Amino acid sequence: MYTLHYICLVLSCVIYFVWTLSCPTRNQYVSVKYVNLTNYSGPYPNGTTLHVTCREGYAKRPVQTVTCVNGNWTVPKKCQKKKCSTPQDLLNGRYTVTGNLYYGSVITYTCNSGYSLIGSTTSACLLKRGGRVDWTPRPPICDIKKCKPPPQIANGTHTNVKDFYTYLDTVTYSCNDETKLTLTGPSSKLCSETGSWVPNGETKCEFIFCKLPQVANAYVEVRKSATSMQYLHINVKCYKGFMLYGETPNTCNHGVWSPAIPECMKISSPKGDMPGINSNEDNSTPSGRICNGNCTTSMPTQTYTIITARYTSHIYFPTGKTYKLPRGVLVIILTTSFIIIGIILTGVCLHRCRVCMSGQ
């Protein structure tokens, strides 16, 4: 057999002594991407058929062949990239894909706030054993953030006691004896997304003391607890000629006096009746009787604010009716409709009605 080389074509003399065109060797076959020819070294006379295989990561369905026809190979279809399966949802996280899931694509994983990523942050669609493709490495896990046990406090405790704490767990602090101790600092703490307790700041149970008040025109009796100044009690005693305005005894409650410290106001009985009200008093009336406030017919019907040593209330005075005032009670009538002789505080005129006290 003889071979004739002419330009780029190869002629072969076959058994019938006829010159025919041959196809290029497979290493010259580069017109189709990602294609490998079967291991056949040639020559490739007219009619030769070779199986076509795709490179790694590419596939062709069905399996195809190429044939030498008049010096040219038939053109196969292109090999397509293999495709990985759609990733499963990442519990407590999310992912993004570049490459549309095909061979060579990459997934990037991130976890939601309050969760830690355990594993690789990325996976790639790579070739596996047997020619298949799959995501490598396996997807990570998003594990909830954990906090160390919350700080303990002296003379106090917290709620939600358990072996371990996770993101969004909350504890609330309280003092063992809330009548003596005051909670300072954050009363509640939260296990945050960083695995630390917030807000910052130390929580304590402390004894908070009250300052001994200075009351004008009075002296203060002190009764101190044997265990703590937190249980400090006082009684305010007005000097002669002054009357208590407010309430006593008073207790130091978490640094605040309760009820509020009273005042001692000078006793005065202005002569004459209050406009619209007749103050009827009989100085010879024995102690224990009552004073009558008698509303005259000339006074328009209206409501006054009555403040006594023990309460504050609104009293309605209907025309022609009598309002009886308990003995021993200082009554202050506030009004802005007319001026009354008395004490002016913050623009409000105060008038003390005369009171039956020990016949005086």
Curated annotation (Swiss-Prot):
Keyword line: Disulfide bond, Glycoprotein, Membrane, Repeat, Secreted, Signal, Sushi, Transmembrane, Transmembrane helix
Signal peptide: 1-20
PANTHER family, per database record: COMPLEMENT COMPONENT-RELATED SUSHI DOMAIN-CONTAINING, SUSHI DOMAIN-CONTAINING PROTEIN
Membrane spanning residue stretches: 328-350
Record-annotated Sushi domain positions: 21-81, 82-144, 145-207, 208-266
Family stated for the protein in its record: Belongs to the receptors of complement activation (RCA) family.
Keyword Transferase: no
Disulfide partners: C23-C68, C54-C79, C84-C125, C111-C142, C147-C191, C175-C205, C210-C252, C238-C264
Residue positions the entry lists as glycosylated: N36, N39, N46, N72, N155, N294
Protein's gene: 4
Protein name as annotated: Complement control protein homolog
Pfam families the record matches: Sushi
Any one GO molecular function term: complement binding
Single GO biological process annotation from the record: negative regulation of complement activation
Annotated Gene3D superfamilies: Complement Module, domain 1
InterPro entries from the UniProt entry: CCP_VACV_C3/B5 (IPR011176), Compl-Cell_Adhes-Reg (IPR050350), Sushi/SCR/CCP_sf (IPR035976), Sushi_SCR_CCP_dom (IPR000436)
Cellular-component GO terms for this entry: extracellular region; membrane
